[in-house]
Amino acid sequence: MKLDKDNLRQDPFAVLRIRDFSIFMLMRFFLILGVQIQVVIVGIQIYNLTPGSTGEKALAMGFIGLAEAIPFILIAIFAGHVADRINRKKIILFSIAFLLLASWTLFYISFNKIYLASLGTFPIYGIIFCTGIARGFLAPTFPAYQSQLIPRVLYANAATWNGNIWQTASVVGPAIGGLLMGFGNISVAYAVSASLVTFSFLIILPITNVPVPKNEIKEKLSNSLTAGFRFVFKNQIMLSALSLDLFAVLLGGAVAMLPIFAHEVLKLGANADMAVGFMRAAPAVGSIIMGIFLAYYPPTKKAGRNLYIAVTGFGICMIAFALSTNIYLTLVILMLSGSFDMVSIIIRTTIMQLTTPDNMRGRVAAVNGIFIGSSNEIGQMESGLAARLIGLIPSVIFGGCMTVLVVSGIMYLAPKLRKLNLDQIT
C-alpha cells in the first residue's frame, strides 16, 4: 500500500529508503569528502608557497577562487543545456573522471617537487582551473538527476538529507585534511583526497540509468541556452532567494582567509595548519546539527520569513568571527554560521526543485550554480582583494554588515518571498 503525502512528509527517513537515492548520496559523500580535503591542502599550500606580506598572501589565496570561478561561469550555461539533452548519469561520470585526473595530478606535482620549484604556484592554479570545468558540468547535473530518483513530495526531505551529507563530508574532510597536514605530509594528503574521488566514481556505477525528460518544444540553441535565465528572472520568489544567497556568500566569503586568521589573528603557531582544518569543519558541524533538527521540523512553513532570519544570522556571525581573538569562540561562531546557512540551503533548494519543470532542471540549476556555486569562489577573490585594500578584519566586518543590509533591501522589494509558505506548493 502506498503511503500518502502527509505520511511521507512526516517520515524524516522516507527518501533514504529509495535505493538509487541512497547510493547517489553515498557517492556525493565520498566525492565531497575528497574535494574538501583538497580545498584545505591547496589553501595551506598556496599560503606557504607565497612570499611577502599578509595582503599578498590573502590575494594569492583569493586567486584560488578566481581560477575555479572563471571556467565554472563560462561553461555553466552550456552545461545546463547539455544536462537537459544528454544522459545525466554519463555527464556525472565524465565530470568525476575529470576531477579524478586533476586530483592525482596535484598529488604528482607535490610529490615531484621539481615542478613547483621551477614554476611556483602556477601549476596549482592551472589544475584548479580544470576542476572548475568539471564543477561547471556537475552543478546543473546533480540536482537535475537527483529529482529523477525521487517522488516530488520528498523534494524537501531530499534537500535536508542532501544538505546533511554535504555538511558531514564538509566536517570530516577539512578535519582529515588538517590532521594530514599536521602529522603527515602534503603528498599523503593529496593521495587520500584523490583516492576518495576515485571511490566516488566507482560507487555511482550501479545507479539506474534514467532517461532525460523529453522536451516537446523544439528550441533554437540560443533560446535553449538562455531559457534558464528567462525562467529565473520571471519568478520573483526564486530570483529573490538566489539573490539573498548570492550576496551572503559573495560578501561573507571570509572562510577562504582561515589560514591567515589561524596564523596571524589567532596566533596558533605550530598548531595553525591543524586548526585550519577544524575551523573549516566548524560551519559544517553547525549545519549537521541544524540539518538533523530540520529533518523532523522542516523550515517549509513560513519559509520566506525563515530564509530572511537565516541570512541575517549568517551576516551577524561573520561580523562576530572577525572580532574574535579566541580559537574556541571562533569555532562556536563558525558553527552558528553553518546552522544558519543550512536553513537557507534547504529553503532555496526546495524552492528550485518544486517550481522548475522537469525538462528545464539542468538549465535552471546552471543559473543557480552561477548565482551560488561561482559566488563562493568569487567571494574568495573578493575577500582576498578587500583584505589587501582595507585590511583583513575590516574587510570581514564590512562583508557581514553589507549582508545584513542586502537582506533588508530584498525583504522590502520581494513581498512574495516574504509571504512564502512552501507547504502550500508541495
Task: Label each region the model flagged.
Residues 1-9, 205-227, 422-426:
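Flexible cytoplasmic inter-helical loops of multi-pass small-molecule transporters
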Residues 6-70, 230, 234-283:
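Helix-loop boundary and gating motifs at the non-cytosolic
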Residues 13-18, 113-118, 216-217, 229-235, ...:
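Helix-boundary and loop/linker segments of multi-pass membrane transporters
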Residues 14, 147, 160-163, 223, ...:
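Short amphipathic alpha-helical coupling elements at transmembrane boundaries
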Residues 20-40, 64-83, 87-100, 122-181, ...:
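Substrate-agnostic recognition of the 12-TM MFS/MFS-like secondary transporter fold
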Residues 60-67, 74-78, 85, 89-101, ...:
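C-terminal transmembrane bundle of multi-pass solute transporters/carriers
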Residues 108-127, 321-334:
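Helix-loop junctions at membrane interfaces in 12-TM secondary transporters
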Residues 118-132, 157-213, 274-277, 281-286, ...:
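Hydrophobic alpha-helical transmembrane segments
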